[in-house]
């Protein structure tokens, strides 16, 4: 993954760092640290990668894999796993960790649910992850559109399980109910970091609003798996991670992911340190001890990384838990 010049997978060209983030241009550059050996990934060059890319273009779909410059894009797309990002490619927030473009979004595309559903069916996905930009400009934060996508995928690919990774719907009453009523198999909302770092890393969000959202969805429909993720390496400490895990368990969140923060450009938040694989293993043990049904913790873990296999394991873990209780 490069820092000063980013590969634009959508156009096959390049763009200078910062063009996507005009609100960050007044900031001084943050130095980029050399990545350790356990972070390095191969450049995407598999035939199936290009087939997946072509299908995304044909259906005019945006993916978070590209927009967020995910390091796992080569591996995932080579297995026909792509996380579709709905409601446009422009976010109304300006988080200091995120590579998604910031600005004034276009109106929602009413044909998008059908195009997403078509792509899911043609890829033959057993499990699909659908995420979105924040849409603070919409009265419901885009909740009805997310629900429409879920319903369209159910019709086109009834055997496919659906995971949604949503915004926080800050000050959008009724949004959680709208999404929960569409009954995704997994409702994911990432806390991203520890509460102390929110003003610097996630300034447009509120930690306890994100927790309330996860708790609310679980209360609305306990059959929906809930999931949340954290980036580490931003300056948090072990005790803070433990507290976030406790908060998530109080909200009855089933699945936690932990991965290394990687700096997209010099204008984004700097990496405080690279967390070692052994530390990720320690975090995984800690999370399991606190009662999470499923834990994914590694340097390259992202919300949708290995989501298909993880969902199967998550469902099996719930069945085992229910059998023990019975």
UniProtKB/Swiss-Prot annotation:
Necessary cofactors: [4Fe-4S] cluster
Signal peptide, first to last residue: none
Gene3D superfamilies: Aldolase class I (3.20.20.70)
Protein residues bound to [4Fe-4S] cluster 1: 65, 70, 76, 304
Main location: cytoplasm
Residue span(s) of domain Radical SAM core: 77-293
One annotated Gene Ontology cellular component of this protein: cytoplasm
Binding-site residues, [4Fe-4S] cluster 2: 91, 95, 98
Family per similarity comment: Belongs to the radical SAM superfamily. Lipoyl synthase family.
Protein name: Lipoyl synthase
